């Protein structure tokens, strides 16, 4: 079977489960053949080997079952950087780039700042910040050991030495003070489980869903973060688009000042910031 024939075949198979069947087919081919998509399109007359077809059809079946494309090719781009991912880590979303963007703004007047990333996953937030601010010391923590392993591999791949990763359940192993804490915690409620896209359910439950109608982890972070923040230090938390008022109320309850909420690139409330007095 030629490349162009497999692309047509795969695209038809993926129409029921993917919003971008043509792109998905090209990405899978690129991964198996270890060629860029431009090469694939330009050389679609080439015949695929038997081994190629075996590998492609295994991946195609998994994608037809709604498994995220990032888990199939083991990589996801975030902040224009490539990140290894696995089913033990949340897949980085474009919405989260607003958290990085705002963190960099609040760090602008600080040199050699110490930053903590709570629930680091594959390390996308910590490493994005580290790549932009080589003078800063970034620590990423996660309760899943495999996530720490993957985040550490990403740091090596990106050759970033100003970041380290620690296995910890929130603040349980943290004994440092920081100029900033950032977090993209789980913030979906358990009741939302039945409404999310099927492919989201392939991602780790612990990284998606939280108690207290999705606000349990956020409340915990806001309540206990002050112990680890210097005076005038900042806390930035990502949350759901309907959670702004509740999240702001937690910041006020625990005596933060200069509280503000920022919208993501889809104009939805996404990140709330507060400063320790």
Curated annotation (Swiss-Prot):
Question: For this protein, what is any one GO molecular function term?
Answer: protein-glutamine N-methyltransferase activity
Keyword Coiled coil attributed: no
Binding-site residues for substrate, renumbered to this chain:
184-187
What EC numbers are recorded for this enzyme?
2.1.1.297
Which InterPro entries does the protein's record reference? DNA_methylase_N6_adenine_CS, HemK-like, Methyltranfer_dom, N5-glutamine_MTase, PrmC_N, RF_methyltr_PrmC, SAM-dependent_MTases_sf
* Any Pfam family hit: PrmC_N
Superkingdom to which the source organism belongs: Bacteria
- What UniProt keywords are attached to this protein's entry? Methyltransferase, S-adenosyl-L-methionine, Transferase
Residues annotated as transmembrane: none
Q: Which reaction does it catalyse?
A: L-glutaminyl-[peptide chain release factor] + S-adenosyl-L-methionine = N(5)-methyl-L-glutaminyl-[peptide chain release factor] + S-adenosyl-L-homocysteine + H(+)
Does the record's keyword annotation contain S-adenosyl-L-methionine?
yes
Might you name a Gene Ontology BP term for this protein?
A: methylation
Question: Where is S-adenosyl-L-methionine annotated to bind?
Answer: 119-123, 142, 170, 184
Q: What is stated as this protein's family in its record?
A: Belongs to the protein N5-glutamine methyltransferase family. PrmC subfamily.
Its function, per the record, reads: Methylates the class 1 translation termination release factors RF1/PrfA and RF2/PrfB on the glutamine residue of the universally conserved GGQ motif.
Protein name per the record? Release factor glutamine methyltransferase
């Amino acid at each position: 079977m030629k490349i162009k024939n497999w692309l047509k075949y795969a695209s038809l198979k993926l129409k029921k489960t993917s919003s971008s069947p043509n792109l998905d087919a090209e990405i899978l081919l690129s991964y198996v053949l270890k060629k860029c998509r431009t090469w694939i399109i330009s050389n679609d007359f080439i015949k695929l080997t038997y081994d190629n077809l075996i590998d492609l059809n295994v991946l195609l079946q998994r994608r037809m079952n709604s498994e995220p494309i990032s888990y199939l090719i083991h990589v996801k781009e975030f902040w224009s950087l490539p990140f290894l991912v696995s089913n033990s880590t949340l897949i980085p979303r474009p919405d989260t780039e607003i958290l990085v963007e705002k963190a960099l703004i609040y760090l602008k007047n600080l040199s050699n700042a110490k930053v903590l990333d709570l629930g680091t996953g594959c390390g996308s937030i910590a490493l994005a910040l580290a790549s932009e601010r080589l003078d800063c010391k970034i620590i990423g923590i996660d309760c899943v050991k495999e996530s720490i392993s993957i985040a550490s591999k990403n740091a090596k791949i990106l050759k970033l030495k100003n970041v380290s990763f620690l296995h910890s359940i929130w603040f349980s192993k943290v004994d440092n003070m920081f100029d900033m804490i950032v977090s993209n915690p789980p913030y979906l409620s358990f009741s939302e489980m039945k409404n999310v896209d099927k492919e989201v359910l392939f991602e780790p439950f612990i990284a998606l869903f939280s108690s207290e109608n999705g606000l349990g982890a956020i409340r915990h972070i806001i309540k206990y973060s002050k112990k680890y923040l210097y005076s005038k230090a900042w806390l930035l938390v990502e949350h759901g688009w309907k959670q702004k008022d509740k999240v702001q109320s937690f910041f006020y309850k625990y005596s933060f000042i200069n509280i503000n909420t920022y919208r993501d690139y889809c104009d939805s409330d996404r990140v709330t910031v507060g400063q320790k007095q």
